[in-house]
């Protein structure tokens, strides 16, 4: 298991409640990190989630530079399934990036860190706010316009570029002004050796106008890059990953037991324990 510990303040309680609510809505998705329990003490909240020991996609990219095209296809398809699950429930992630995409012990992906996610988002009920990680923000976010779930498809495009080319198509170092100018005004640049189908996919994910972005005007599953993907098998996690984490899996029976004291500022409706977590605790106590 993994434990996310967040200090509790009155001003941020609604944000913590929102994250808990979104994690519960995402419980049935095999491509999103599962919440086992949410607890609170006097001054902190605890999100207890599954431990994803395969590492992050970001770490893999740093180690490899770029990934084999079949790996890119497989990971992109699973990420797309996770995003579609969220979007069908009117949830926008807002921070899709390689470091927020983990691998489980079998090699399947999990989207993590829903702390910036927002629910209740539709094309007629947009949100605002410059939120996320600069290199992965969509133009409409940087221009401080209202936006919807289309921003996640843009971010996916940047992630795919990192996987396939080992770089961003808008890379301009760490100078914020230049990065913003490139994303909002310039066209993406790809290396000449980039796979033609990947390039075609990226050109449609990285459209400046949200309504013209693949994933918005058309289902991403129909793109030719995914012609070899059996989406029904993939959604059931019956597709065999091309990479399986080789780290030794050790059973850790050291559990965190929270102090039994009443929170100073209790958040009604926050505490939660999933049935699977209850069963796990029973097995450990035997």
Locate each region found by the language model:
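Conserved N-lobe beta3->alphaC-helix segment of eukaryotic protein kinase catalytic domains
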Residues: 5-27
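Activation-segment/catalytic-loop signature of the eukaryotic protein kinase fold
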Residues: 38
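Conserved short submotifs of the Hanks-type protein kinase catalytic core
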Residues: 43-56
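AlphaC helix of the protein kinase catalytic domain
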Residues: 58-67
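Activation segment signature within eukaryotic-like protein kinase domains
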Residues: 75-76
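C-terminal regulatory tails of eukaryotic serine/threonine kinases
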Residues: 216-286
